[in-house]
Amino acid sequence: MATPVRGETRNVIDDNISARIQSKVKTNDTVRQTPSSLRKVSIKDEQVRQYQRNLNRFKTILNGLKAEEEKLSEADDIQMLAEKLLKLGETIDKVENRIVDLVEKIQLLETNENNNILHEHIDATGTYYLFDTLTSTNKRFYPKDCVFDYRTNNVENIPILLNNFKKFIKKYQFDDVFENDIIEIDPRENEILCKIIKEGLGESLDIMNTNTTDIFRIIDGLKKQNIEVCMVEMSELEPGEKVLVDTTCRNSALLMNKLQKLVLMEKWIFSKCCQDCPNLKDYLQEAIMGTLHESLRNSVKQRLYNIPHDVGIDHEEFLINTVIETVIDLSPIADDQIENSCMYCKSVFHCSINCKKKPNRELRPDSTNFSKTYYLQGAQRQQPLKSSAKRTKVLEQDTKKVEQSVQQQKTGNY
């Protein structure tokens, strides 16, 4: 049976099998009659016939060699007989290897033809998409019923969308279109990836033209749109409004969302200044640690030191998971000990006592002397120590009182 050309199904990207798709499949026989398809079929058939002719020729040679081997006279000289048998045996082995090679080539052509027929049938009935990748010689299958389950209508959640999309394509063994080395992929694979990522973009989030059919343009456009929004937000923030996380944070999902945005923004910035940053892991870890209050930071560092990093997990994902687990383990048990949000900045990531915007504080929460002023989260409040200037002033007042008392006693004696 003739092999269908790629154009028969490469534009079919709808999960539901519509009448248009069915009609496209029904016209396969017509498509095969094009000069291009007929030429491909002719070349393949000629190749098979050539293999068959060579196979028959080698089989004839093999039969002749075996017959010659049987006719060798036992009356000949033993040494001559051994030499003839050895030479004949080597020739027979070469012919047999050549026959095996030809049989495998013929079977491969037949298998590819059957796969193309199966591809045409199953893809048209909506079971899966079949595509080629740059990183594998085998064909890959993406089940049509596996839908990209992340949706967003908010531009602020684009980093999460891209992160989930990257995990999704890794799961189904697509080419990693986030790698700088990959600049072009199979057209069919490109169409499938465009369809998948558009499933995650809500109707109100019309960042890219819905008719765009280049996955690289879509990803680049999403990154640029997101970085512009994030840069504007960061420029409008005051220093005291940066993210601060302590052990009272209970909203793990929101915290993970925030840390993922931070990591993805850092990665995007570094990708613009250098293609392959050797210290990227250290920079990402420093960025995450910079958001943690000292009551949490040391515990996270200890866990990162003690727990080995699973090579199957990205380093940034390992960092974020470690922070989340540490927050959960160190958070106070009683809910009544935790505020719903900070009374100064309304953040849900830290309590009021640690807020950088808290007024009239003598010490900042990231100061090395903070432990002298307040206990860690969940402990009782401690009275702040008086400064040296205050202690000196109190001492002077006490000295004056003593002098006045002595003077009064002397006056009374007189």
UniProtKB/Swiss-Prot annotation:
Region called Disordered, residue ranges: 378-414
Biased composition (Basic and acidic residues): 393-403
Protein name: Transposon Ty4-J Gag polyprotein
Record field: compositional bias (Polar residues): 404-414
GO biological process, any: viral translational frameshifting
Coiled coil: 39-115
Organism: Saccharomyces cerevisiae (strain ATCC 204508 / S288c)
Extra information: Retrotransposons are mobile genetic entities that are able to replicate via an RNA intermediate and a reverse transcription step. In contrast to retroviruses, retrotransposons are non-infectious, lack an envelope and remain intracellular. Ty4 retrotransposons belong to the copia elements (pseudoviridae).
Described purpose of this protein according to its UniProt entry: Capsid protein (CA) is the structural component of the virus-like particle (VLP), forming the shell that encapsulates the retrotransposons dimeric RNA genome.
Domain of life the protein comes from: Eukaryota
Keywords, comma-separated and alphabetical: Coiled coil, Transposable element
